[in-house]
């Protein structure tokens, strides 16, 4: 499988994760039911489904920690007042950057994906906001890893 096709599949999985997490956060629907409904409605490869499950459940499980990181990086923007799309995009990206031990997606790829999701689904300012928050987090927490990826 080529890199472009894999990247495109990963992008679709991240879109699904964003939509699931947004729905669960905004409606209090049960996360496992929303995820399974999505997998039934939009079948995907076993590898993509596993990635989706890891993103959704991992991000949701660690959301309190991820929200603290967001608030440290953007102290003027309380998470509970943040647009739902921005919050979900940031949570997913931070889960990938700080917690997910399986993928170890390169920092630049995670940031680029998050910015693209913010452009696709957020407001006019979402992509700049997401990029700024993630840049701050990388500087504070991941500078050594970023240098090693260069």
Curated annotation (Swiss-Prot):
Q: Which domain of life is it from?
A: Bacteria
- Entry-linked InterPro entries: NusB-like_sf, NusB_fam, NusB_RsmB_TIM44
Record keywords: RNA-binding, Transcription, Transcription antitermination, Transcription regulation
Q: Which SUPFAM superfamilies match?
A: NusB-like (SSF48013)
Please give one Pfam family short name: NusB
Write out the GO MF terms.
RNA binding
A cellular component term, taken from the record's GO annotations: cytosol
GO-annotated biological processes? DNA-templated transcription termination; transcription antitermination
Q: What does this protein do?
A: Involved in transcription antitermination. Required for transcription of ribosomal RNA (rRNA) genes. Binds specifically to the boxA antiterminator sequence of the ribosomal RNA (rrn) operons.
NCBIfam families in the cross-refs: nusB
HAMAP family recorded: NusB (MF_00073)
For this chain, the family text in UniProt reads: Belongs to the NusB family.
Q: In its UniProt entry, what is this protein called? A: Transcription antitermination protein NusB
The taxonomic lineage of its organism, from the top, reads:
Bacteria, Bacillati, Chloroflexota, Chloroflexia, Chloroflexales
């Amino acid at each position: 499988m080529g890199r472009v096709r894999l990247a495109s599949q990963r992008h679709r999985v991240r879109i699904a994760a964003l939509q699931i997490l947004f729905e669960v956060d905004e409606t209090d629907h049960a996360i496992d039911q929303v995820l399974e409904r999505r997998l039934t409605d939009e079948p995907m490869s076993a590898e993509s489904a596993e990635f989706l499950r890891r993103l959704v459940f991992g991000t949701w499980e660690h959301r309190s920690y991820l929200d603290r990181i967001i608030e440290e990086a953007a102290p003027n923007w309380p998470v509970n007042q943040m647009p739902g799309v921005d919050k979900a995009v940031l949570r997913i990206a931070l889960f990938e950057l700080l917690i997910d031990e399986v993928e170890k997606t390169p920092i630049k790829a995670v940031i680029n994906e998050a910015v693209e999701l913010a452009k696709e689904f957020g407001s006019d300012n979402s992509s700049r906001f997401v990029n700024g928050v993630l840049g701050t987090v990388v500087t504070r927490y991941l500078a050594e890893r970023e240098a090693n990826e260069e």
